[in-house]
Amino acid sequence: MKTMFLLALLAFTATSAVAQLYTTCSQGYGQCQQQPQPQPQPQPQMNTCAAFLQQCIQTPYVQSQMWQASGCQLMRQQCCQPLAQISEQARCQAVCSVSQIIMRQQQGQRFGQPQQQQGQSFGQPQQQVPVEIMRMVLQTLPSMCSVNIPQYCTTTPCSTITPAIYSIPMTATCAGGAC
């Protein structure tokens, strides 16, 4: 009798745990088999991409040795590695971030204003990125970093793209599609 009671209690506990796991997984609060997405890449990596594009791509180098000696190779790695680790959707926001950084830096140089290292100030309207900057970033980053950028990035203004790069959620993959 005691053995039957223990087996019944064990079965009930296991069933409750599975039901609880399924409930929390299906509600999005937990994960069945947690597979973390790469962490959101903060602004400094996007600054590295912008600096690389401005210093290494827009400036012609005659010899590849100069390119290597200038630190461009390291900057390229620091730019491409985070891009390869984020989702395609988040890469669209990354392209916008790089384009906006370049635009702000060019405006600062043109008007003698200090460069902003972080994003726009709260409440400040986001300016539209000039087409030539966006085109240069879209033509360079995907091939240079061997990553895909969604097609809609070429036609959607940056001001309408949500900052997906800063809000990458954890995903759950469950056996049998239970989640």
Curated annotation (Swiss-Prot):
Signal peptide as annotated in the record: 1-19
Keyword Lipid metabolism: no
Keyword annotations of the record: Disulfide bond, Seed storage protein, Signal, Storage protein
Top-rank lineage group of the source organism: Eukaryota
PTM field: Contains 7 disulfide bonds.
GO MF, one example: nutrient reservoir activity
Coiled coil: none
Family: Belongs to the prolamin family.
Official protein name in the record: Avenin-like a2
Organism listed in the record: Triticum aestivum (Wheat)
Its job: Seed storage protein. Not integrated in the gluten polymer through disulfide bonds, unless incorporated by reduction and reoxidation during dough making. Increases dough strength and bread volume, but decreases dough stability when added into a base wheat flour.
